[in-house]
Structure formats: C-alpha cells, structure tokens
C-alpha cells in the first residue's frame, strides 16, 4: 500500500488570514510615516491590478514594504536609530533629573 500525505481539504485556516491582514495594516501605518502616500497608493493599486484581493497579493505587498522600510532605515532615517553611527541613544533627549537622590 502506497503512503500518501493527507489531503489538504477545506478552506485555508482563518488565523493565517487575520495575521496577514494585521501585519499588512501595521506595515502600512509605519510606511505612511516615512513615504509619500501617493507612492504607497500607486504601489497598492499595482499589486491589486496584478493579484486582485488575494493573500498572494498581500504577501507581495508585505515583502515590498518590509524591504523599502529596511532600506529607508539603513540609509539613515531620522526617525530611526538603525543606520546611524553608534545607533544613537534614544534616551539622550530626556533631560537629566535635577532632584537626583
């Protein structure tokens, strides 16, 4: 008798869909802080025209946004410590307390 893997029956699991949507939402919010909204809209339209409203399209958009943000941060975004010499100190903007014990 030949062994075969179990058939993948039924629709894809819901939690995966929800996770993809949540990741995409978070990336979009971060991308809007760093890139022109018109550029992001054009990118979204391009992906939608190519893939429609599918998980495949969402995955491609996630990959592109992750790469764009990574490159943006590595080139020295002023909103990030990534790419700056020494990484910068995020606490340096907090003035020292005058009433130290």
From Swiss-Prot:
InterPro entries: RetroV_VpR/X. Keywords: Activator, AIDS, Cell cycle, Host nucleus, Host-virus interaction, Phosphoprotein, Transcription, Transcription regulation, Viral penetration into host nucleus, Virion, Virus entry into host cell. This is Protein Vpr. It comes from Simian immunodeficiency virus (isolate Mm142-83) (SIV-mac). The modification Phosphoserine is found at residue 80. GO terms for biological process: symbiont entry into host cell; viral penetration into host nucleus. Residues 81-101 are annotated as: Disordered. It is found in: Virion; Host nucleus. Interacts with human UNG. Gene3D superfamilies: 6.10.210.10, VpR/VpX protein, C-terminal domain (1.20.5.90).
């Amino acid at each position: 008798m030949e062994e075969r893997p179990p058939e993948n029956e039924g629709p894809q699991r819901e939690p995966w869909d929800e996770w993809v949507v949540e990741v995409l939402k978070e990336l979009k919010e971060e991308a809007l802080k760093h890139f022109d909204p018109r550029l992001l809209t054009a990118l979204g339209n391009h992906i939608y025209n190519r893939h429609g409203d599918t998980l495949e399209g969402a995955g491609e958009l996630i990959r592109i946004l992750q790469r764009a943000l990574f490159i943006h941060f590595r080139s020295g975004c002023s909103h990030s410590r990534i790419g700056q010499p020494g990484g910068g100190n995020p606490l340096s903007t907090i003035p020292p307390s005058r009433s130290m014990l």
